[in-house]
Regions:
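Active-site neighborhood of divalent metal-dependent phosphoester bond hydrolases
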Residues: 46-49, 54-169
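Residue-level marker for buried hydrophobic side chains located in beta-strands
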Residues: 5, 32-34, 61-62, 115, ...
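Divalent metal-coordination and catalytic microenvironments
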Residues: 8, 37, 64-65, 102, ...
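Active-site-proximal beta-strand elements of phosphoester/diester hydrolases
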Residues: 2-10, 114-120, 238-239
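N-terminal active-site segment of His-dependent metallophosphoesterases
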Residues: 1-51, 55, 68
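Active-site environment of divalent metal-dependent phosphoester hydrolases
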Residues: 10-14, 40-42, 66-72, 124, ...
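Acidic, His/Gly-rich catalytic cores of divalent-metal-dependent hydrolytic chemistry
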Residues: 131-266
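A general structural motif
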Residues: 27-29, 56-58, 116, 215-216
């Protein structure tokens, strides 16, 4: 059995299929894991999500910010933007089935000895705490409180974690760390506006450059296309190489650590 983790697909189904063909993916014995942002921006969001759903137990994913945005639009608390490519999903006859399936996906999951998350895991949380906090959001998304969650999901505050945070502020902070984070300070303060490492100012630096205080887990993440998949440090695997922006689509096999990429299709 081979286990593959793939970066941000964002509705680009053709390169995903090409990647799976390259590695001779067999849905009867292999597993594909998406690091989030399964849909949006690319040309085939509906076909992509249907394809992954049809893989059944051969597919797992964590939710990314674009996936959560779709669910917010589905709840009627947000409108699709000019750059969004989710209208086909919103009009699909099976849209309720799609939304139900998407709401059941976690924000953090473990496969083999790897932890997969969309944006990252802040150094101020140990791994047990990260899973516990991620579960708080997942449980809310699957509950009758989900509309309220999505109404209050957007925003950059609170910008630093406190254990005494409650309600919508607590859930927003957890969501921002796991699905939007790029830079943070030593204290865990988030800086959510900057994407370029060259322009970030102190005290902020990439979340993965902070000491993890004895944590040694392997982390696979997406979200940050500007990194271009360059090495981020030991046991860290950046998978978003920005296919939707002209880069390749990247996939890693978790046993061999072999990386396979699909360049832009013409």
């Amino acid at each position: 059995m081979a286990t593959y983790a793939v970066g941000d697909i964002q509705g680009c189904l053709a390169p995903l299929k090409a990647l799976l063909k390259k590695v001779r993916f067999n849905k009867d014995k292999d597993l594909l894991i998406s690091a989030g942002d399964l849909i949006n921006r690319g040309p085939e969001s509906l076909a992509t999500i249907r394809f992954c759903m049809n893989l059944g137990s051969a597919f797992k994913m964590v939710l990314g910010n674009h996936d959560l945005h779709l669910l917010a639009v589905a709840e009627g608390v947000r409108s699709a933007g000019n750059k969004d490519t989710v209208e086909e999903i919103l009009q699909a006859p099976d849209r309720q089935q799609i939304f139900h399936w998407l709401r059941k996906q976690p924000l953090l999951l473990q496969a083999n000895r790897f932890h997969i998350v969309h944006a990252g895991i802040p150094h101020i949380w140990d791994i047990k705490k990260a899973y516990s906090l991620a579960a708080e959001v997942s449980q809310t998304i699957q509950s009758v409180q989900r509309k309220s969650y999505f109404e209050h999901m957007y925003g950059n505050s609170p910008d630093v974690w406190r254990d005494d945070l409650k309600g919508t502020e607590r859930l927003r902070a957890i969501t921002n760390y796991l699905t939007r984070m790029r830079f943070c300070s030593h204290k865990g303060e988030l800086e959510l506006k900057t994407k370029d490492r060259k322009t970030i100012e102190k005290p902020f630096k990439p979340w993965f450059e902070h000491k993890r205080h004895g944590r040694t887990e392997n982390i696979i993440f997406g979200h940050w296309a500007a990194l271009k998949g360059l090495p981020c440090g030991p046991q860290l695997y950046a998978m978003d190489t920005g296919y939707v922006w002209g880069g390749p689509l990247r996939m890693i096999e978790l046993n061999s650590l072999e990386i396979t990429e699909q360049p832009q299709l013409t």
